[in-house]
Design a protein with these regions (language model features):
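Residue-level signature of transmembrane alpha-helical entry/exit and packing/kink sites
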Residues: 8-16, 82, 86, 105, ...
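Interfacial loop-to-transmembrane junctions
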Residues: 215-238
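Transmembrane helix-loop-helix
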Residues: 96-108
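Functional transmembrane core segments of multi-pass inner-membrane proteins
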Residues: 106-210, 214, 249-256
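Long, highly hydrophobic alpha-helical transmembrane signal-anchor segments
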Residues: 1-34
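Membrane-proximal soluble regions of multi-pass membrane proteins
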Residues: 26-81
Length: 256
């Protein structure tokens, strides 16, 4: 007989493994989407020698460790990004379910987290958020709204609460102050989270982005241009899990 504590842990182990498998697919998206390549047609292969990978070369995290971070065929180094993204996605899934429980909303949040992780890496490297990912997030927003019909108005307002002011800023500055991808991201995730959460997410993103980028400018000489995607994603993710709690605590302090 399997001990009860172990039975309780097994679903989380399965969830983590599933998250790493999805993380493996995210790596494909991270490399191929910016290059305009198909994420489903071409088989996985070594980026150096082009050798097609066997299934045992693609076991999330473990294959990279077993191979010593090198291609089995040509021995070229394999970026540590692969196991890091796989493990990070698995941990994000555990975090979401650990805080939010096993429910439909958590399913939406896990898919959202994977999309945010993917676009963060791509935006950090290219200063562009792929429209495909924003469309995927918009579809999640529609699903989240359907699952939360009693708060339909909040979701609809959320889609415009930050994106419309950013769009006006985009027009006034002719795109110098904010990117179109950031606007679409806030519209899609505003639909997912509702207006209160998306406003808080944006405030957190601005604080985080300002602090970290100023630090990078001082320590590494980074330029003034920054990719907002990673910071917006961080604000969105944290607010999805803790936003309502923080908002209620703040209102309680105000006696409201």
């Amino acid at each position: 007989m399997i001990p009860l504590p172990l039975l309780e842990i097994i679903p989380y182990i399965i969830l983590f493994i599933y998250g790493t498998i999805v993380g493996s697919f995210l790596n494909v998206c991270i490399y191929r989407i910016p290059e305009g390549q198909s994420i489903v047609k071409n088989p996985s292969h070594c980026m150096t020698c082009g050798n097609r990978l066997k299934w045992y070369d693609m076991v999330p995290v473990f294959s990279w460790l077993i191979l010593g971070g090198k291609c089995r065929n040509c021995k070229a180094p394999i970026s540590p990004q692969y196991p890091l993204i796989e493990a990070a996605n698995g941990l994000l899934y555990l975090w979401i379910v650990g805080v939010n429980g096993w429910n439909a909303q958590s399913l939406v949040y896990t898919l959202m987290a994977s999309a945010l992780l993917t676009l963060s890496i791509i935006d950090w490297r290219t200063y562009e958020i792929p429209v495909q990912i924003n469309l995927f997030l918009a579809a999640l927003g529609i699903l989240a709204t359907i699952l939360d019909v009693p708060h339909l108005v909040s979701h609809l307002i959320g889609a415009a609460a930050i994106s419309v002011p950013l769009w006006l800023l985009y027009l006034l500055t002719k795109g110098a102050a904010i990117g179109g991808g950031d606007i679409k991201l806030m519209a899609a995730c505003g639909l997912i989270l509702g207006w209160q959460n998306i406003v808080l997410a944006f405030l957190l993103a601005c604080i985080l982005g300002s602090f970290i980028h100023l630090l990078r400018m001082k320590l590494t000489g980074a330029g003034k241009t920054l990719a907002m995607g990673p910071y917006l994603s961080a604000g969105i993710f944290v607010t999805a899990l803790y936003g309502q709690t923080w908002i209620h605590q703040y209102l309680a302090l105000l006696g409201m």
